[in-house]
Amino acid sequence: MNVWVIMNSCKEIQMNNFIEKLKLRSPLIHNITNMVTINDVANIELACGARPIMAMAPQEMDEVTGICDGLNLNIGTPSEERFEAMRIAARMAAKKNIPIVLDLVGVGVSRFRMDFVMSLLDEVRVDVIKGNLSEVKAVMEHGRCDGGVEVTDTADESDAKALACRAALRYGCICVITGETDYVAELCDEADCYDNNESSQMSTDATGTGVMDTGVVNAVASDADGYTHNYRVGSITGGHPMMKRVTGTGCMLSGLICAFVAADCDDKYGAVTAALSSMKSAGGLAASDMAEHGRETNSCHFIKPGNAAYRDRLIDAVYHICDGDYELM
């Protein structure tokens, strides 16, 4: 697939608009997430103003999902019972127009995971699929990614955007590819792409404090049959290398995405971009705060903060961003 950037616009995404909607609605999010990070997912959703529920028994899926505003599915610790719960919950969410986020954690590690994801995507239209480059590529090629759930950044920007566009086209949803730079793509008609763009390229400033530079990048891509399609395509940079030293930052991000989308179903692409930007900003803020605290404690012969302290500060940073303590564009 070839992708050509064809337009730039100065129209800006207003981060605070999405944060305000999140605070006002306080969406109830049903998370069927992995057992390694379940507590952190719940806490980061609470930090942003959402209300998490972590039901997992198949017997209560219809009732629980039916009262929720968003469904967050994560295949990180799979089992037959967990996958059955996800199927039931996804069917109910689709029936009631509840947005679904699917996190492809380790999808290429085993045929068990891949078969479930393929069957779910065949049965239910999800609103957002999210994974690192290897995971999204594995789903698109029905293959394996031998790197486990670790992020691999082996493609250049145009390749990553093209992959995101292909996935968005195939599954009729927003595709997020995470990494040092996050990419987000959505299939749209020409009028939407040119008249209603509200998101796109964002980055933190050099200090990592979360100042956003915004603009719009739209693209046209040709598929394998030569047909052309219009896309909204965005890239978000920032964060901090420490985010890779904490397990579950990707799972937390999925919970955050689901919360933002559930709070603004009318602009899901903008909501996804706002969630990605909030997480990148929080990553930089957490590192800055930890470095400052480390200088203080080092002089007193205390243990300097490490990755556990960083995780706590990351959640705190999301709390303060969504509480309006930091001015974001």
Regions found by a protein language model. Name each.
Residues S281-M329:
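Charged C-terminal helix
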Residues G234-G248:
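Short pre-catalytic strand/loop immediately N-terminal to key active-site residues, enriched for Gly-Thr
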Residues R113-D205, V217-R232:
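Conserved phosphate/ATP/ADP-binding segment of small-molecule kinases
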Residues A93, I98-D122, V128:
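Glycine/small-residue-rich loop that forms an oxyanion/phosphate-binding "nest" at active or ligand-binding sites
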Residues A138, R245-S277:
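Short, small-residue alpha-helix embedded
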Residues N31, I53-A55, I100-L104, V128-L133, ...:
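General beta-strand structural signal in soluble alpha/beta enzymes
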Residues E12-L102:
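Conserved N-terminal subdomain of the carbohydrate kinase-like
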Residues L163-A164, A168, K268-G283:
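Short, well-structured alpha-helical segments that form the helix of a local strand-helix-strand
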